[in-house]
């Protein structure tokens, strides 16, 4: 895929990149692309069930749809709903798991706090989705959560942290866009690059359906292998964790040291990480984009195929 200097052609991507505290893995286009790829790999029975459940239990119109509601595709529309409700429902921790940089592979439960984490949230929502006696609206919400959280899980910065709120406190100059402080946050920041800027620049203006087709063709030879690997959610987290170390943080100039693992509620907490890193003038230009884009492409494609695997498995006995 060519990576010329084409800037963000979608309003969603532009807004998310410069929204100071955005933590919305993959942004609108990325999440919708994951859903559209998944849709291609659902069994006929699962696809029919998903479409029927979502159609019969539409999103409550009271919710402000950040990415905009769409009637083009029910799964694509469902993919971003969890970000619309996270503030009011106060379930932000469901979207990520903070495994500190430098951690050794092992059980993930110690990193899942009292408010939950993405792996636990997927497991809990699958229980609801599989329950044939559960209320249809509850099952539809569970489905929307699962569609979104599997996408979140494949954004590397939703699987790790460096005492920096998953990269939100890492100011980065992206091509000609210099990092600036906004209250207690920074933009562009490392998290926003991976949510929107990197995949949007890579997509070169393609809409989610076009991007899904491109990635589907690009990884056609790999998909069967991914499917044969089976469902291993914890392994997928560690994949993202390793990619965060080798590419997300590892390809930045200058390098960012591993920080002591301390709780950070804002970028100006006691560790003052945002201001310290701002003075390092961290940059991500063409070289970084060339390293990062293939990783983002593969994670979005894997996320779609694996989401289909989870739904096919869950709905096989739930209908």
What are these regions (language model features)?
Residues 24-149, 156-319:
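N-terminal, motif-rich segments that launch catalysis or mediate targeting to/interaction with membranes
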Residues 1-12:
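Bacterial N-terminal signal peptides that target proteins for export
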């Amino acid at each position: 895929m060519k990576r010329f200097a084409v800037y963000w052609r979608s309003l969603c991507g532009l807004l998310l990149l410069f929204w100071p505290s955005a933590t919305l893995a993959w942004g609108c286009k990325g999440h919708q692309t994951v859903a559209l790829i998944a849709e291609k790999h659902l069994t006929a029975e699962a696809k029919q069930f998903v479409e029927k459940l979502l159609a019969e239990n539409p999103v409550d119109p009271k919710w402000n749809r950040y990415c905009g509601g769409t009637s083009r595709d029910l799964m694509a529309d469902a993919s971003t709903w969890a970000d619309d409700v996270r503030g009011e429902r106060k379930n932000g921790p469901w979207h990520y798991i903070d495994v500190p940089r430098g951690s050794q592979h092992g059980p993930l439960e110690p990193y899942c706090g009292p408010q939950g984490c993405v792996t636990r949230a997927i497991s809990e929502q699958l229980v609801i989705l599989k329950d044939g006696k559960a209320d249809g609206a509850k099952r539809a919400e569970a489905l929307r959560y699962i569609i979104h959280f599997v996408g979140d899980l494949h954004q590397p910065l939703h699987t790790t942290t460096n005492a920096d709120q998953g990269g939100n406190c890492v100011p980065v100059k992206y091509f000609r866009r210099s990092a600036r402080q906004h209250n207690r946050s920074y933009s562009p920041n490392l998290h926003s690059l991976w949510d929107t800027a990197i995949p949007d620049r890579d997509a070169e203006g393609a809409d989610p359906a076009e991007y899904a087709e491109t990635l589907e063709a690009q990884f056609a030879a790999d998909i069967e292998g991914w499917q044969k690997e089976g469902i291993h959610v914890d392994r997928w987290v560690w994949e993202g964790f390793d990619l965060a170390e080798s590419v997300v943080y590892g390809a930045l100039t200058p390098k960012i040291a591993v920080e002591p693992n301390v709780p950070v509620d804002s970028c100006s907490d006691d560790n003052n990480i945002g201001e310290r890193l701002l003075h390092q003038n961290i940059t991500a230009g063409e070289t970084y984009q060339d390293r990062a884009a293939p990783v983002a492409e593969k994670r979005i494609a894997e996320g779609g195929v694996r989401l289909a695997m989870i739904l096919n498995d869950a709905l096989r006995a739930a209908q």
